[in-house]
Structures are given as structure tokens and as C-alpha cells.
């Protein structure tokens, strides 16, 4: 591979990464704005974030986690 081709490829990769990083930043701001809007309407943002995290779990993992949490709460009388 010639130095020119390598340079062009590297520049393309860097350019793509920069563009995606900018998009990621824009999306993060949109998510933040949505959470702020939800909070202004009385929703609990912490609970919403917990729900989003739980939704990413496999159904079996979620069931295991729920069972363990219930066991610990019962054990501690919570």
C-alpha cells in the first residue's frame, strides 16, 4: 500500500470518527433534554434511568436479578 493510500484511509477513518463523536454528543444532549422535560412533568428521572437499564437485560437475567433483590429485601426486612 502506498503512503498516499494509507494517508487517505487514515484521514477517512479520522473524519468518520469525528463525525460520529459529534453526532454522539448531539444525541446525548437530546437525551438530557428529554430527561429534563420528563422531570418538569413530574416523572422521576432516576427511576426512568433504572427502567432503561433493566430493559436492556435478558428476560432470564432480569428475573434472576428480581428474585435476588426480593430475597435480599426479605432477609433485611425491607
Curated annotation (Swiss-Prot):
Coiled-coil boundaries: none
Superkingdom of origin: Bacteria
Molecular function as annotated in GO: DNA binding
Matches recorded under InterPro entries: GapR-like (IPR018753), GapR-like_DNA-bd (IPR046367)
Membership in a protein family: Belongs to the UPF0335 family.
NCBIfam families: PRK13694.1
Protein name: UPF0335 protein RP113
Organism: Rickettsia prowazekii (strain Madrid E)
Biological classification of the source: Bacteria, Pseudomonadati, Pseudomonadota, Alphaproteobacteria, Rickettsiales
